[in-house]
């Protein structure tokens, strides 16, 4: 019987990017024959965001568990039953809360980036202390650590040179929905007509947060205009 990898999407409800990152890693696992020979995937998600993972509904190697509720004690009991009696071998991304500490040996950690170190002015004192405490606990463990970029891996070495975790870099890569593959030249032209786009354009989908540093994009466009 296959062991299971649990992907916990409940911890990313406040950040949609984290859920899409989980979706991407699940998709990558499903394409890996070695992983699929040994494991099946379990996703724990809330009803509000379950549709993000609809593409996995028909996959026999994915068990989607939709948990509806905000009671922390009931959720903890649900997670404990799922992990203890559900054949779960690994938990991603494990949070080092009271429940997570019970399953630390099964944990795979994830730190998206180290913004609180490089841009501390964007965080309050309490949040900074909380992030630093968590990062020290995770990097001081010998559990596997997933990072989202080689830049984050360099930051890990810079800020936590004595870390014990084994690091794997898994880049942010967008899962391409089937609908995108069906886009035709006619549909493209209809979008151009709708928004009166008579010339080539650049689409920048980043949200307007200060740390996204949109000025780099503006400066790049200025350079292109100067170069003709």
Predicted features along the sequence, with ranges:
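Carbohydrate transferase catalytic cores enriched for Leloir-type hexosyltransferases
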Residues: 1-228
């Amino acid at each position: 019987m296959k062991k299971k990898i649990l992907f916990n999407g409940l911890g990313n409800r406040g950040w949609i990017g984290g859920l899409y990152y989980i979706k991407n890693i699940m998709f990558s696992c499903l394409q890996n024959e070695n992983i699929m020979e040994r494991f099946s995937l379990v996703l724990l998600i809330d009803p509000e965001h379950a549709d993000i993972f609809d593409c996995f509904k028909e996959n026999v190697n994915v068990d989607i568990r939709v948990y509806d509720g905000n009671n922390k004690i009931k959720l903890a009991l649900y997670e404990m039953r799922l992990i203890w009696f559900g054949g779960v071998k690994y938990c991603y991304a494990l949070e080092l809360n009271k429940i997570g500490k019970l399953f630390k040996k099964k944990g795979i950690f994830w730190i998206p980036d180290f913004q609180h170190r490089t841009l501390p002015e964007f965080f309050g004192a309490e949040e900074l202390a909380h992030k630093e405490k968590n990062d020290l606990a995770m990097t001081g463990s010998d559990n596997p650590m997933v990072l989202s970029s080689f830049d984050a891996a360099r930051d890990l070495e810079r800020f936590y040179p004595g870390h014990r975790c084994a690091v794997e870099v898994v880049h942010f890569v967008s899962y391409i929905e089937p609908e995108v593959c069906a886009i035709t030249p006619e549909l493209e032209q209809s979008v151009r007509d709708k928004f009166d786009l008579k010339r080539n354009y650049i689409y920048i989908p980043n949200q307007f947060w200060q740390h996204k540093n949109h000025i780099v994009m503006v400066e790049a466009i200025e350079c292109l205009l100067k170069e003709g």
